[in-house]
Amino acid sequence: MDSAETDTPSTRSTPNGPGLRQRKLRRTRDQLIREALELFLAQGYEHTTVEQIAEAVEVHPRTFFRHFASKEEVALTPISAIDEAFLAALEVRPAGENPLQAMSGAFRAVLGRVRDGELEGVDGALHMAMMRLVERTPGLLAEYLRRSEEMEGRLARIIAAREGVDLDDDFRPRFIVAVFKAVGRVVSREWYLRADTDLEALSVAFESALDSLRPELFADWRRPGA
């Protein structure tokens, strides 16, 4: 894994999928993520070293750093994968949906992929357990919240583009996204802390929480012609 590798017909990507080298790199990365999360859960984030993670996968620590800049990055990688999948799902929601409908639909779609094991590098039960660890690890929680704030900005830009409004002049995309994210955090946190791994029930609870909001939040405020 640490030796230099060059592209050959057996390692080069093809139209039919990644080559052997890419598959090996992907497999090593996935193993590093899983072993890291399991070690974090077993002995605590602070007490787990990069050397221990690398040893569990039987690679040199420098291989770890070829994939991740830090323990913090590997710990939050599954969360980032879910966020990216959510953004991609939102981009293709039907144009006629209002912002909350679009974000809710994207959330359901991604949660379904996690539940069915279809989101690469994300194990649903392991992710839920890791989120409980994030909640009680100050350093990880601070970085998670920082990334969540960045995510809100990206979501707001997508919503503004969908609705045909200028994000610099119209606060509603940021407002709607903040409401959506707040509901998601409150509902999800309850699931994490009580160790509930039923993702279908989580989806239902999230929808119920959104439905309890004032009807005005669900109104269609698209600019005519957008």
UniProtKB/Swiss-Prot annotation:
InterPro entries in alphabetical order: DNA-bd_HTH_TetR-type_CS (IPR023772), Homeodomain-like_sf (IPR009057), HTH-type_TetR-like_transc_reg (IPR050109), HTH_TetR (IPR001647), MftR_C (IPR041347)
Keywords recorded for this protein, A-Z: Antibiotic biosynthesis, DNA-binding, Repressor, Transcription, Transcription regulation
Pathway this chain belongs to: Antibiotic biosynthesis; tetracenomycin C biosynthesis
Annotated GO biological process: antibiotic biosynthetic process
Domain of life: Bacteria
UniProt keyword annotation of DNA-binding present: yes
Domain HTH tetR-type: from-to ranges: 26-86
Listed transmembrane segments: none
Biased composition (Polar residues): 1-16
Gene3D superfamilies in the record: Homeodomain-like, Tetracycline Repressor, domain 2
A family per Pfam: TetR_C_14
GO molecular function: DNA-binding transcription factor activity; transcription cis-regulatory region binding
DNA-binding region ranges: 49-68
Residue segments, region Disordered: 1-25
PANTHER family: HTH-TYPE TRANSCRIPTIONAL REGULATOR RUTR, MYCOFACTOCIN BIOSYNTHESIS TRANSCRIPTIONAL REGULATOR MFTR-RELATED
Function text: Represses transcription of the divergently oriented tcmR and tcmA (tetracenomycin C resistance and export) genes by binding to an intergenic operator region. This binding is inhibited by tetracenomycin C.
Protein name (record): HTH-type transcriptional regulator TcmR
Species of provenance: Streptomyces glaucescens
